Amino acid sequence: MPNTQSPYNAFAMLLSSNGHPVTPAELHGLLIGRSCAGAGFDADAWLADAAQLLEIEPGDSVRNALVGLQEMVKGELTSDDMAIVLLLPTDDAALSDRATALGQWCQGFVTGFGLNAGGKDLSDEAKEVLQDLVAISQVQEALEESEDGESDYMEVMEYLRVAPLLLFSELAKPAAPAPKPSLH
């Protein structure tokens, strides 16, 4: 039985009870994607991008949740940690549900990245990450309820926790200030 108190389920209930036909995974992917493309962390710009998926204007509770999600993502992307936390169903959800959410996360990421990358030149590694994300978004039903399926899911999820950081560091991470010359 899925954990109804998980952050994913709580956000899903908030979205559905407010008439938004989108999953937390897709919204989180959109946010990470746009952030990795260099969109910055302006709340109004994020809310405008999110509104396209939400289909109707979000109420205060959804707006507050979206701004809170953005603050969490900003902290993850700008910290020295080398991984992000994906907003996905917990491990006690059916593998098919988790795989579907993983695909939705990738769809959101590719959309957010595409809306904000604006023809920027990408390294071969960055292009490969984007191709991987597109491929993952299209094979969401391919995982079977088995030990191998579970292992494949975990492997893909671990990849997605670090792969976007390559894009962020290439396109969006603020340059470190140049060291001041020392006086001798």
Swiss-Prot record:
It comes from Pseudomonas putida (strain ATCC 47054 / DSM 6125 / CFBP 8728 / NCIMB 11950 / KT2440). InterPro entries: YgfB-like, YgfB-like_sf. Transmembrane segments: none annotated. PANTHER family: UPF0149 PROTEIN YGFB. GO terms for cellular component: cytosol. Signal peptide: none annotated. This is UPF0149 protein PP_5201. It comes from the Bacteria.
